[in-house]
Amino acid sequence: MNKFILLLSLVTLSCVLAVPQLPAAQQYYMKGSFNIPYFNIVEPIELIYDSVNNRQYISVYNGMDITINFYNQDNTYNVGPVKYDMVCTTTPGNGSLVNVLPTEPSSWVYNGTSTVNGVQVFGYSQKITQYGRTGFYNFYVDANGVPVQFYMDGVDYVFGSHPDVYVLNFDIYTTDISSYESYFDIPVLCNNAKEAPAKENQFDGLFSSIGDNLLAKEEQASNLFKEYKAQYNKEYSSQDEHDERFINFKAARKIIATHNAKESSYKLGMNHYADLSNKEFNTLVKPKVARPSVTGADSVHDDESLRSIPSTVDWRNQNCVTPVKDQGICGSCWTFGSTGSLEGTNCVTNGELVSLSEQQLVDCAILTGSQGCGGGFASSAFQYVMEIGSLATESNYPYLMQNGLCRDRTVTPSGVSITGYVNVTSGSESALQNAIATTGPVAIAIDASVDDFRYYMSGVYNNPACKNGLDDLDHEVLAIGYGTYQGQDYFLVKNSWSTNWGMDGYVYMARNDNNLCGVSSQATYPIPTKN
């Protein structure tokens, strides 16, 4: 009997000890989906990670966009759609591989079993609290240690996007990549590839704020940076890159801690850009394209009269603003500002709020310099709407977070159309205020390149370093109202970085402050057709 009890105890103990470890592989293949539940995005993804040979294959939407990184050859091929055709470009230079597995498994805490996607899993977690913002991260493996799901409630570990809920599901995973060697064959389409200018690796750089001791010695800072890399799955391709990231990391900590230690109308909070240089941040979130010399606007809104308009406007109160959307890891901000203005002004004119398709603009509005996820302008969007007649609804032509083939020849239009569009007098905040009050939400371009804008959390943003020249504008947003908060005038601005950024997706931009950040430098709105 005692032997039986001892045997049973040993069996029980062996079961307790048989907890699979988090995977750590130098080579692997995975197939699954990358999901953003907030905006109902389910992006099929196929990825080969090969740190042994310093190369990588990434395909999304079943081959709609393919990136093959040959960092061992200082070259990258990208195959993707441009309006109705697939094209190939090649980009010289090195970069960092995208690893979807935790690089420091020992820093994760085991927290028991559960069921995910119908599979009994073993979960590991991290909880990271920084400047009032807490992120929760869970990595689930099956009994054999095979990844099942990476759940991120905070910053996107994988591709380095703003705080949100991200879910990476693994359908297939193997560390034997020999069967997938053909994936690294250069596509035939790339025989005539066009060379794109070299740019910073768009997948580099996540965030952290590990402590706020500005007097820390270099050794202490180095230890904090080590924790940062472990917590946020950071890998750098060389010692030189590591040293550069360390400098950026220390600078980000200083920016936030220094700002929040003083009196200010707004507060900052850490997010996923702390080890990025300004150039990298601009490339990742706000790609700039050549500005069109002619906008094609029908007229200019130059009415600066403030006598007969309300002292406060918020078009959400009239149900003329759709919920905050999420551009994800795509430089498509220009489409969200444009659809937001068309949605709002159509609502004011016709009394109906219709959520319109940003993806149709990404895929089809290849006009006057606009390049889908590579950036663009509201004027291009409105010119396209005039040309095509009407955009589809968001539900009929849903957002992909990715350039796609244009479907405007087959998709059902929404019926929302415009007769033209109007530019607001450049630099006139009173004209912008009048336009918002009398016509509805207005698409505006701002300078979002100042370091602290990416960390904005609350209050009236009024950093004097923010510029207002036309060539300084790098991010399209939507002005939906104005008012005064704690004695400071503001424009109420809707961003496209989900509700996890700022004040549930919104920011108070300083008003009557010398056109700070260029809020009125390039404001545009459409003229909806009256039903």
Curated annotation (Swiss-Prot):
Its main location: secreted. The active site is at 333, 475, 495. Residues 1-18 form the signal peptide. Disruption phenotype: Cells proliferate more rapidly than wild type cells and exhibit supernumerary centrosomes and a cytokinesis defect. They also produce fewer spores at culmination. Form large fruiting bodies with large spore heads. It holds the Pfam family Inhibitor_I29. The keyword Mitochondrion does not apply. GO terms for biological process: G protein-coupled chemorepellent receptor signaling pathway; immune response; negative regulation of asexual reproduction; positive regulation of apoptotic signaling pathway; protein localization to plasma membrane; proteolysis; sorocarp morphogenesis. Keywords: Disulfide bond, Glycoprotein, Secreted, Signal. Glycans are attached at residues 94, 111, 423. It is found in: Secreted. GO terms for cellular component: cytoplasmic vesicle; extracellular region; extracellular space; lysosome. The keyword Repeat does not apply. Disulfide bonds join 330-373, 364-406, 466-517. Inhibitor that slows proliferation of secreting cells (also known as chalone). Requires aprA for activity. PANTHER family: CYSTEINE PROTEASE FAMILY C1-RELATED. Interacts with aprA. Belongs to the peptidase C1 family. This is Counting factor associated protein D.
